[in-house]
Regions:
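Bacterial N-terminal signal peptides
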Residues: 11-21
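Structural recognition of the beta-strand scaffold that forms the well-ordered cores
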Residues: 39-43, 71-76, 129-135, 173-178, ...
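Conserved catalytic region of serine esterases and O-acyltransferases that act on ester linkages
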Residues: 35, 52, 236, 240-364
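Substrate-gating cap/lid alpha-helix
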Residues: 184-222
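Serine-esterase "nucleophile elbow" of acetyl-processing enzymes
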Residues: 25-79, 83-91, 119-127, 131, ...
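Solvent-exposed loop/turn segments at secondary-structure junctions
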Residues: 46-50, 77-83, 130, 137-142, ...
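Oxyanion-hole/transition-state-stabilizing segment in secreted/luminal serine hydrolases
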Residues: 34, 43, 54-55, 92-151, ...
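Beta-propeller domains with acidic blade repeats across secreted/periplasmic ectodomains
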Residues: 348-578
């Protein structure tokens, strides 16, 4: 065991040990019963939302109940609280009537506009029988002062939920899940050691236990077990102290399944990989429905005039494709595979979208020397063609470029812009490297560093790899074997908004310290959970992310429509272009 894992605050350690000995991890002895075709919906914060990227909980459930044909959907999102669950295409961020009385510091007019369904409407659409709610992490940063307000907010949420009949027949079974403990990684990374964080997380866990007992709903204490894991495991279980990694989520999946539904054997264990792959496939399509990229046109302020002509059909189709993947999961739990392409071919056909291009002008695209002849440059400057899509067909829709220390040109391309369309092949945007190997001033070699991406509108180099904007996520791509191809992908932070895809975090630029500045445009509502607390922003501005500290901060919030460039002068002043 490392020294880091041995060092625990005495007061906190004694308190935790007593709590674990007395109450275990689950309050209310009655486990929630699984019925055939049970509809299970996850709501809440980043702890729940991030599960969609790993898929272990859903996999565990399908392996334990292969004949139950479970329907599982994840509605969780970064920054959510019981009452505050904002969305760029909703007129109100409040999850239920009266919720505005609690998180009053967040009750700012954010300009969100649209007809995206409310939380209750979504739960009704999904016919929720069981609701698993993850709360308490964001709220814990309000400390002791915010504890009573949180209990009142959670109480109001529970009472509201238990009055609903989302499935049209009876009230939902509700399980409250506490935050996990904060893992001390400070010996390896410049991160908080978790002492203060865990003091607050423990308080908020106990508050959730109290509210659950008062309302006779199931409560799962995730704080105590994860604290024990950190003390006994030889491997890290989080990426940055508060976000579980793959191993962490594998353990967490079993904790959730046991604690909420009771201990059951994984009767389809031999099909785990097949089921896990099917779950991740389903989650990809569900994400493109519930968190639809470019939703400003599907539900938001840009819905008119063209949204009604296009998006209702695409949404219907992607929901059919998601349902097909539910069937694929059920088959996988029996060891069977499914021809997804054949099934997708039977989903609704999308009507032809008529162009609004009027054909004015010649519309001729100039290439090579013909284009250079038309461009005027300042005195003392020279413009030459380095690489073109005529020579490199992957060079389509380039959006950001940068030279590395070897003099190679890296380009992010996004032929999938503006977003994935249901029925098309999955996006295959790329990060490309171009080299001039014979020193003639023109690129003659292309290397695909990464493909299978979606809208690479920002990237920046770092010693540990390349940070890339990917819709709602900031990811890190690593080349661990030196072949100039990414072989590791890590989701660093989530909760960024891609409501208008070309407004999402972009135009990455590093300052002299190695921190990365990122631009964000209007209409967006970003809510990112970090080791230091939630970072929120609306309607344009700029972020600074320090990889050394895993620290994100909002450096400016201003109504900037399309920020497409960031630069620094000799005095370190920032210049923003839009």
């Amino acid at each position: 065991m490392s020294v880091r894992r041995k060092v625990v605050g005495l007061k906190f350690g004694l308190m935790l040990g007593i709590a674990m000995a007395i109450v275990g991890c689950t309050d209310k002895s009655d486990a929630i019963r699984i019925n055939k075709e049970s509809h299970i919906v996850l709501i809440g914060n980043n702890l729940g939302s991030r599960m969609m990227n790993f898929g272990h909980f859903e996999t565990e459930m399908h392996l334990r109940y292969p004949d139950s044909l479970l329907f599982i959907r994840n509605m969780a999102d970064g920054g959510n609280t019981p009452g505050f669950r904002p969305h760029s295409s909703r007129n109100s961020p409040w999850a239920f009537p009266g919720a505005e009385a609690f998180q009053t510091e967040l009750a700012q007019k954010s300009g969100s506009i649209g007809h995206f369904e409310t939380e209750d409407e979504w739960l009704t659409r999904l016919k929720a029988d069981v609701i698993i709610a993850f709360f308490g992490y964001n709220e814990s940063f309000q400390g002791k002062e915010g504890l009573e307000n949180y209990k009142e907010e959670l109480q109001a949420f529970v009472q509201h939920t238990l009055k609903q009949t989302y499935n049209g027949k009876n009230t939902p079974k509700l399980a409250l899940v506490s935050p996990i403990a904060f893992e001390d990684l400070s010996a390896k990374m410049d991160l908080p050691n978790g002492i203060r964080e865990n003091e607050n997380l423990s308080l908020y866990t106990e508050a959730m236990r109290e509210v659950a007992a008062k309302n006779d709903v199931l409560f799962l204490d995730a704080f105590a077990p994860t604290s024990k894991w950190y003390a006994t495991e030889t491997e890290d279980l989080t990426a940055d102290g508060f976000q579980l990694n793959d191993l962490g989520y594998q353990k967490f999946a079993k904790l959730l399944a046991d604690g909420i539904f009771g201990k059951h054997k994984s009767v389809a264990e031999s099909h785990r990989k097949l089921v896990h792959d099917a779950v991740l496939e389903k989650n990809w399509f569900w994400h493109n429905d519930f968190k639809i990229p470019n939703g400003v046109h599907a539900y938001g302020r840009r819905y008119d005039p063209f949204g009604p002509d296009n998006y209702p059909y695409e949404i219907e189709k992607i929901r059919q494709m998601t349902a097909i993947r539910d069937t694929a999961i059920w088959k996988a739990s029996r060891g069977e595979t499914m021809d997804l392409a054949a099934a997708d071919a039977k989903t609704r056909k999308l009507p032809e979208v008529k162009t609004n291009y009027r054909g004015d002008g010649e519309g001729k695209y100039l290439y090579g020397q013909e284009a250079l002849d038309k461009i005027s440059v300042a005195e003392g400057y020279k413009l030459e063609l380095f690489a073109s899509e005529e020579e490199f067909e992957d060079l389509a829709n380039p959006v950001q470029m940068s030279f590395d220390n070897k003099g190679r040109l890296w380009v992010g391309v996004m032929p999938s812009y503006p977003h994935y369309k249901a029925g098309d092949s999955k996006p295959n945007d790329k990060l490309l490297i171009f080299e001039d190997t014979d020193n003639d001033g023109k690129a003659d070699k292309q290397t695909v560093f990464a493909d299978g991406l979606h809208l690479t509108i920002g990237f920046e180099f770092a010693p540990e790899g390349v940070y890339v904007s990917q819709g709602t996520n900031l990811i890190l791509l690593k080349d661990t074997d030196g072949d100039d191809k990414a072989d590791v992908k890590e989701i660093i932070l989530s909760g960024f908004d891609d409501h208008d895809t070309h407004h999402a975090i972009s135009a990455f630029a590093a300052d002299p310290s190695g921190a990365i500045y990122m631009a964000e445009g209007v209409f967006l509502h970003t809510n990112v959970e970090t080791a230091y607390g939630p970072v929120r922003g609306t309607n344009g501005g700029f972020y600074r992310y320090s990889p050394q500290r895993h620290h994100l901060e909002r450096t400016a919030q201003l109504p900037i429509p399309n920020p497409w460039g960031i630069a620094f002068d000799d005095w370190g002043q920032q210049f923003f272009a839009h």
